[in-house]
């Protein structure tokens, strides 16, 4: 049995290695805020959230749409989905309580433990089957439709009756029937467990029916050695069936484990959705397109991590950057540029892992890699100057990127003077654009920004943090020519309370 709720045809691999730039992405996009909102204190949900979001960069369009449809079902049937998740968790936790039986070297102990676990699993599977019978019609996605169809096919009444019958026989309430052969030195070999005779006869028939000849012996209650030998004979006979039953419990356990893992992603999405809905923030399911289409347009896009930590409503942005490879963002200090850049990265990750996005509408091409190059504070761990450190990080990014990747730059190459920083940024941008890399660049380097503006490139767009005439920030971005000032005097007047 397979859940197949993350991919159409394979399981979700929780042991897969994270991207090499995982630490930088987490730091620069403040992903821990998103992960914690998905987990709500649950360590397992946290692990799945982190890996599902970061692994999403490798998803194709079909996988993204597949998950979107499943998530839409989850949002419409949240209580049912959480109930299924609870059943999976309870099954795994109950199995752990019986784990010591698996450590035994004795087949009899292993068999008894497997019977107890399988009895518990049967009860949990019946709960899943009941949910499928009652609620399958309320789910529309391909993933859940296939999941419930699998449950109905695999978990019919005949299956449960057969399992219960086998478990009842394996309890050996009337003893164990074993056949054996004589080997060398008259030692017993080829011990085989046999099915007990049919007990459908009436008690009268059992009394008067002639029985085949049999030879038997009894062991004294005090004969410990004889009892031990008899126990060993029994273990030889039931060894194969004990191992087979243990494998059956492992098979069902692996199903519940994967069901829990794959549903954990959707439970995390439900957790975030609930928090955003409580704050009145909009979400929508994005329209992903192929990498080469170069689409990036949205309405009301906001920073989801900021929204999760703020009490007041967050300002969203409307941008149409379709057919653009380069987006340069300039303008007033503390005008929302870095927040906007973070919202771009977060929305891309959320879209590609199959989530909703923090926007009224969103359409973008998928990227084959997402990288961040943010300015870093100087600290004692740096082995060289800030510019050398920036160039070293840029080299690492280049080593790992492919065509159709996306890079987010935040005030990069500003550790040197204006002219040198602009020249470095200029050379790097030209190289990236030649390789079909999409770039979002927040910068105060006027020569760099205006140099590209003067080129009148069709595949570039220039955004500016809006500033009102009285110096107030609207935290919205508008399309406009880069300016030579970042209005730092506004901050001076605000901090020191002087007149503008």
Question: Each predicted region: which residue ranges?
Answer:
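Amphipathic alpha-helical coiled-coil segments and their boundaries
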Residues: 107-110, 114, 234, 245, ...
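Alpha-helical initiation/capping and key positions within long helical/coiled-coil segments
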Residues: 113, 251, 255-258, 386-389
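ATPase nucleotide-binding head domains, primarily ABC-like/P-loop NTPase cores
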Residues: 291-500
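Charged, amphipathic alpha-helical linker segments immediately N-terminal to NTP-binding catalytic cores
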Residues: 258-305
